[in-house]
Amino acid sequence: MDPSQNPNVFHATTIVCVRRGEHVAIAGDGQVTLGHTVMKGNARKVRRLGRDGQVLAGFAGAAADAFTLFELFEAKLEKHGQLQRAAVELAKDWRTERRLGKLEALLAVADKETSLIISGTGDVIEPEDGIIAIGSGGSYALSAARALMAHTELDARTIASEAIGIAGDICIYTNRNVVVEEL
């Protein structure tokens, strides 16, 4: 089945990461959807990880798979202590371990210097413009964040929050209950 047609996959959230100046923010909505039913409106899908909480992470995808990825990424981060190294090591594991290859989730991760997407195929992608948007409302949030970056002086936190709000107005799998973490 095409993932876009599966009611249990990638329809649970929108995450956006915005980097502006010396600041980076990751925001996520709070809606959890199972099939065509909203199960929860205040889920927390954005977290601080690593020593002293210096890495931000947000997940989109099947909930159990996303939590598994969070745990695996956090273990790599604790072991290697550096965002890019942890992401690459997780991607290596993802490509070699069968159980990981079937996980249907994406992670957006960021520290003070770097923002990355860790994809469901084990790819590690660094955006060229400092903006990441994943999940069911990702395209809407990405468009909103890019417009706000280009035409306003808003800070990273505000842009991330507004982008989720705009996505929440358009995407039925996203709400306006926004959680933001910032470095």
Swiss-Prot record:
InterPro entries: ATP-dep_Prtase_HsIV_su, Ntn_hydrolases_N, Proteasome_sua/b, Proteasome_suB-type
Matches recorded under SUPFAM superfamilies: N-terminal nucleophile aminohydrolases (Ntn hydrolases) (SSF56235)
UniProt keywords, alphabetically: Allosteric enzyme, Cytoplasm, Hydrolase, Metal-binding, Protease, Sodium, Stress response, Threonine protease
EC number: 3.4.25.2
Enzyme class: hydrolase
Compartment(s) of residence: Cytoplasm
Catalytic reactions of this protein: ATP-dependent cleavage of peptide bonds with broad specificity
GO cellular component: HslUV protease complex; proteasome core complex
Major localization listed first in the record, in broad terms: cytoplasm
GO molecular function, one term: threonine-type endopeptidase activity
Active site: 13
UniProt: Na(+) binding residues: 168, 171, 174
Signal sequence annotation: none
Regulation: Allosterically activated by HslU binding.
Gene Ontology terms describing biological process: proteolysis involved in protein catabolic process
Subunit-level organization: A double ring-shaped homohexamer of HslV is capped on each side by a ring-shaped HslU homohexamer. The assembly of the HslU/HslV complex is dependent on binding of ATP.
HAMAP family: HslV
Family in the record: Belongs to the peptidase T1B family. HslV subfamily.
Function per UniProt: Protease subunit of a proteasome-like degradation complex believed to be a general protein degrading machinery.
Name the record gives this protein: ATP-dependent protease subunit HslV
